């Protein structure tokens, strides 16, 4: 079995995520509790009485804290991936799993990134729209034509038949209109999203670059496939530079998955919450065994089933 672990990005968060892992595993608790944040992580992640979990400055550290905790449990159970990757924010979780960041670092960096992205989006009438069943080159032409109305770019290449555009709302709406005329099956506006992974996030990239100057990066123990490349990091590349680029550049998840297939990966474990990445895997690599994990029961079931395969 050649295993890759994928880490979810924001969007599938919900109150209560991670509570069962927290109750059952000291390794999860140690990772989850390692960061010093300006808010009560337990209160927001497990209960969210104030309804702030969907605000990106809260979403990001909560998602990464969950992922780091699950990674600690996976390590405790002897799960050793050959490769790791993540969708957008999930790249920070992947880097923690690979040994580049400590759990404390990853969670605190996610909080910083979330605030920087929220700040960059302030005052912009922005949006993101999923575009179904249109070729990426055709959609790029639509975005170029609509850019007369403002910034609009393809921000996510998720899987065959699913792309996401983002930027300033007028331009995004125009690009979606052109996409439908060009043959897109559906265009679905995404609620509560900023212009993530577009050039409008340049201020967030600048903020991250400054923060990374004070961070120590560990040695990568597991190969990471990077969002802005769709593959492993070339020799001579800089992880901080790739993360600065990532926040303001397209996420090449379909390319990442195809690369995992080329590398011989035959099993993929998605660390949720949610199972969006598993859906992308099934459309991109239909021959690969894939499962998503959000609870201890799900993890036990997956590991038992995979052990019986061998």
List PLM regions with ranges.
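FabD-like malonyl-/acyl-CoA
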Residues: 1-139, 267-297
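Alpha/beta catalytic cores of group-transfer enzymes, especially the acyltransferase/condensing modules
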Residues: 10-12, 37-42, 98-248
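Non-catalytic positions within long, well-ordered alpha-helices that form the structural scaffold/packing
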Residues: 75, 180, 258-264
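Short glycine-rich catalytic loops that host catalytic nucleophiles or stabilize transition states
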Residues: 189-192, 261, 294
């Amino acid at each position: 079995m050649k295993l890759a672990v994928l880490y979810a990005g924001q969007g599938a968060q919900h109150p209560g995520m991670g509570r069962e892992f927290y109750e059952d595993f000291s390794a999860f608790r140690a990772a989850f509790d390692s960061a010093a944040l300006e808010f009560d992580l337990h209160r927001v992640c497990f209960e969210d009485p104030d309804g702030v979990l969907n605000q990106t400055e809260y979403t990001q550290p909560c998602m990464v804290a969950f992922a780091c905790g699950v990674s600690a449990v996976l390590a405790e159970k002897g799960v050793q991936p050959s490769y790791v990757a993540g969708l957008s924010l999930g790249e920070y979780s992947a880097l923690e799993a690979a040994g580049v960041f400590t759990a404390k670092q990853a969670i605190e960096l996610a909080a910083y990134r979330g605030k920087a992205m929220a700040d960059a989006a302030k005052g912009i009438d922005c949006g993101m729209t999923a575009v179904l069943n249109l070729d990426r080159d055709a959609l790029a032409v639509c975005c170029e034509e609509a850019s007369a109305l403002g910034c609009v770019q393809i921000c996510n290449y998720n899987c065959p038949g699913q792309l996401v555009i983002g930027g300033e709302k007028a331009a995004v709406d125009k690009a979606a209109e052109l996409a439908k005329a060009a043959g897109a099956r559906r265009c679905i506006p995404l609620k509560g999203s900023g212009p993530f992974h577009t050039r409008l996030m340049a201020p967030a990239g600048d903020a991250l670059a400054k923060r990374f100057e004070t961070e120590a990066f560990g040695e990568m123990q597991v190969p990471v496939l990077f969002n802005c490349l769709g593959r492993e990091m070339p020799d001579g590349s800089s992880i901080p530079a790739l993360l600065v680029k990532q926040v303001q550049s397209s996420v090449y998840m379909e390319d990442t998955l195809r690369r995992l297939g080329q590398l011989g990966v035959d099993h993929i474990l998605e660390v949720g919450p949610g199972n969006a990445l598993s859906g992308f895997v099934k459309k991109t690599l239909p021959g690969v065994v894939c499962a998503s994990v959000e609870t201890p029961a799900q993890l036990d079931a997956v590991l038992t089933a995979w052990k019986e395969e061998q």
